[in-house]
Curated annotation (Swiss-Prot):
<feature type="cross-link" description="Glycyl lysine isopeptide (Lys-Gly) (interchain with G-Cter in SUMO1)">
    <location>
        <position position="253"/>
    </location>
</feature>
<feature type="modified residue" description="N6-acetyllysine">
    <location>
        <position position="147"/>
    </location>
</feature>
<feature type="modified residue" description="N6-acetyllysine; alternate">
    <location>
        <position position="434"/>
    </location>
</feature>
<dbReference type="InterPro" id="IPR050802">
    <property type="entry name" value="EF-GSTs"/>
</dbReference>
<feature type="modified residue" description="N6-malonyllysine; alternate">
    <location>
        <position position="434"/>
    </location>
</feature>
<protein>
    <recommendedName>
        <fullName>Elongation factor 1-gamma</fullName>
    </recommendedName>
</protein>
<dbReference type="InterPro" id="IPR004046">
    <property type="entry name" value="GST_C"/>
</dbReference>
<feature type="compositionally biased region" description="Basic and acidic residues">
    <location>
        <begin position="221"/>
        <end position="254"/>
    </location>
</feature>
<feature type="region of interest" description="Disordered">
    <location>
        <begin position="221"/>
        <end position="268"/>
    </location>
</feature>
<dbReference type="InterPro" id="IPR001662">
    <property type="entry name" value="EF1B_G_C"/>
</dbReference>
<comment type="subunit">
    <text>EF-1 is composed of four subunits: alpha, beta, delta, and gamma.</text>
</comment>
<dbReference type="InterPro" id="IPR036433">
    <property type="entry name" value="EF1B_G_C_sf"/>
</dbReference>
<comment type="function">
    <text>Probably plays a role in anchoring the complex to other cellular components.</text>
</comment>
<feature type="domain" description="GST N-terminal">
    <location>
        <begin position="2"/>
        <end position="87"/>
    </location>
</feature>
<dbReference type="InterPro" id="IPR036249">
    <property type="entry name" value="Thioredoxin-like_sf"/>
</dbReference>
<dbReference type="Pfam" id="PF00647">
    <property type="entry name" value="EF1G"/>
</dbReference>
<dbReference type="InterPro" id="IPR004045">
    <property type="entry name" value="Glutathione_S-Trfase_N"/>
</dbReference>
Amino acid sequence: MAAGTLYTYPENWRAFKALIAAQYSGAQVRVLSAPPHFHFGQTNRTPEFLRKFPAGKVPAFEGDDGFCVFESNAIAYYVSNEELRGSTPEAAAQVVQWVSFADSDIVPPASTWVFPTLGIMHHNKQATENAKEEVKRILGLLDAHLKTRTFLVGERVTLADITVVCTLLWLYKQVLEPSFRQAFPNTNRWFLTCINQPQFRAVLGEVKLCEKMAQFDAKKFAESQPKKDTPRKEKGSREEKQKPQAERKEEKKAAAPAPEEEMDECEQALAAEPKAKDPFAHLPKSTFVLDEFKRKYSNEDTLSVALPYFWEHFDKDGWSLWYAEYRFPEELTQTFMSCNLITGMFQRLDKLRKNAFASVILFGTNNSSSISGIWVFRGQELAFPLSPDWQVDYESYTWRKLDPSSEETQTLVREYFAWEGAFQHVGKAFNQGKVFK
């Protein structure tokens, strides 16, 4: 079974393919998508990264065994199992067919139509109208194919479904309003069936379909473009004026800035996104440095070093402790799938890492398990309501605020942070743990 690290930027639909495939196969995929572990545009240009991935592109996957591979379809294939890849030569060929179709037929018109509505590409009316017609053709083709089929290949989800769904994702979220998509009932049924599978939801969260077709906003586009400096012209010296024209041209060429590295459409989208406001900016400064505790926790003994440091420096006025428990233990079946629920939640909370820490544990065995954990948040309230991006999973848990001074809290923090202890409140044996840091 594959295991390793996926380098990407947040909300990269190309990376979703591999993450969903891993949910089905049980591959253990860690995601690095934010500083300090991965800074898109910087980390992927370092010599160390380029030695492993010469193209410098993301997503990129590094296996625990040292195996490296880039290109999203190749990564998704690698972390898949035989069922996803196609269990017969014929099925495998059909899977490759649809994966190729997504790249060659869906990505170009989808980009042409959707990207201007996001303010990251200029609008061309004729090109957009052509793209709409091409999308209609694609949805119609899929609709005819799916008239008597639940999935694209065979009777179960394959990489074909995963890839095509991810490629259509922004169309359904941004521009395929009800009046446009109603002509393709079989395609809609299939899309909804896929995104509501637990393995898809673990990665995508709740997908909200477009209610009103988004339009190009010229003002938004203008604001997203980098502003060029226009320095004041200074009168040149007499000697400068006397320089030969050819010599002055050469100097201008030498002084011209190097063109930026070419980015694909998704990288352009990321670069064009306005910087979000810090949801925690309203809070007073705290003496507790979470990153320093995380370093202690990662690099030194938990019981003898990290925990004493935590309690010595914890700021109970600037931070809060919470106990979380999964609401629906009866729905937990295979332990690897239960563990993937935790991983999926962590992935969707990636932008919260700077202001939170958690140790979440899966207890029990197949068909008899539970999930609970201890969370540390900046401020005195749950952090999730501060951003819509963080609200996908938290309502699936019960949350109880803890008193840092109580003996119960001291015990819970020790057991959950160290992954050892009686865990008397659980009634099941420790299976495995995940840390959000």
